[in-house]
Amino acid sequence: MQIDDALLQRLEKLSMLEIKDEHKESVKGHLAEVLGFVENIFALETNNLKTDTHLSTPLREDEPKSQPHIAKEILSQNKHSQDHYFVVPKIIE
């Protein structure tokens, strides 16, 4: 696809960007490269490819573990704790 001044001006308007005159030729070149890459992707023959629709990550069983020493250590890092909970300032009236 050819990127001309009219198309670049339209893209500027749609994107609400202003491209300085000294950068316009460079931007047109970069856009042409991107569109060329997209055209290559569209040209790929994918009709006969087998798709893997059942890909998933196997789940592990959740096994609760009681580790009270970890909770005590975490609560000890805070200056304000009470009855195994963090005490924080009231933020909702």
Curated annotation (Swiss-Prot):
A Pfam family it matches: GatC
EC number assigned by the record: 6.3.5.-
Signal peptide: none
Molecular function, one GO term: glutaminyl-tRNA synthase (glutamine-hydrolyzing) activity
Domain of life: Bacteria
EC primary class: ligase
Reaction it catalyzes: L-glutamyl-tRNA(Gln) + L-glutamine + ATP + H2O = L-glutaminyl-tRNA(Gln) + L-glutamate + ADP + phosphate + H(+); L-aspartyl-tRNA(Asn) + L-glutamine + ATP + H2O = L-asparaginyl-tRNA(Asn) + L-glutamate + ADP + phosphate + 2 H(+)
Keywords: ATP-binding, Ligase, Nucleotide-binding, Protein biosynthesis
InterPro entries according to UniProt: Asp/Glu-ADT_sf_sub_c, GatC
GO biological process terms on file: regulation of translational fidelity; translation
Record family assignment: Belongs to the GatC family.
Main function: Allows the formation of correctly charged Asn-tRNA(Asn) or Gln-tRNA(Gln) through the transamidation of misacylated Asp-tRNA(Asn) or Glu-tRNA(Gln) in organisms which lack either or both of asparaginyl-tRNA or glutaminyl-tRNA synthetases. The reaction takes place in the presence of glutamine and ATP through an activated phospho-Asp-tRNA(Asn) or phospho-Glu-tRNA(Gln).
Subunit and interaction comment: Heterotrimer of A, B and C subunits.
UniProt-listed NCBIfam families: gatC (TIGR00135)
The protein's name: Glutamyl-tRNA(Gln) amidotransferase subunit C
Biological source species: Helicobacter pylori (strain J99 / ATCC 700824)
Gene: gatC
